[in-house]
């Protein structure tokens, strides 16, 4: 239990930020899975559409500070390679 006012505030902020980060991280996993499932089905049109949405979301997460720029670029690049292989 926090003893100082500032510690209590930091504890509250941590709860809010943890919840927000969990939302973004879950959505990242979901958009990644949607691309991979389209690739698995060899559905080029669906994969390209899902990849476009994933690319936008990864870069949105970078602007929010959820992911680092290099991490997002690496993930997008690896997904794009799989989409291009169809």
UniProtKB/Swiss-Prot annotation:
Instruction: List the taxonomic lineage.
Output: Bacteria, Pseudomonadati, Campylobacterota, Epsilonproteobacteria, Campylobacterales
Gene3D superfamilies to which the protein is assigned, alphabetical: Ribosomal protein S20
Can you cite a GO biological process for this protein? translation
Q: Which InterPro entries match?
A: Ribosomal_bS20, Ribosomal_bS20_sf
What NCBIfam families does this protein's entry cite? S20
Task: Extract the PANTHER family matched here.
Answer: 30S RIBOSOMAL PROTEIN S20 (PTHR33398), SMALL RIBOSOMAL SUBUNIT PROTEIN BS20C (PTHR33398:SF1)
Report the family membership: Belongs to the bacterial ribosomal protein bS20 family.
Q: What is this protein called?
A: Small ribosomal subunit protein bS20
The entry's keywords: Ribonucleoprotein, Ribosomal protein, RNA-binding, rRNA-binding
| Function per UniProt | Binds directly to 16S ribosomal RNA.
Q: Which Pfam families match?
A: Ribosomal_S20p (PF01649)
Please provide, in alphabetical order, the Gene Ontology terms of the cellular component aspect for this entry.
cytosol; small ribosomal subunit
Entry GO MF terms: small ribosomal subunit rRNA binding; structural constituent of ribosome
Native organism is Aliarcobacter butzleri (strain RM4018) (Arcobacter butzleri)
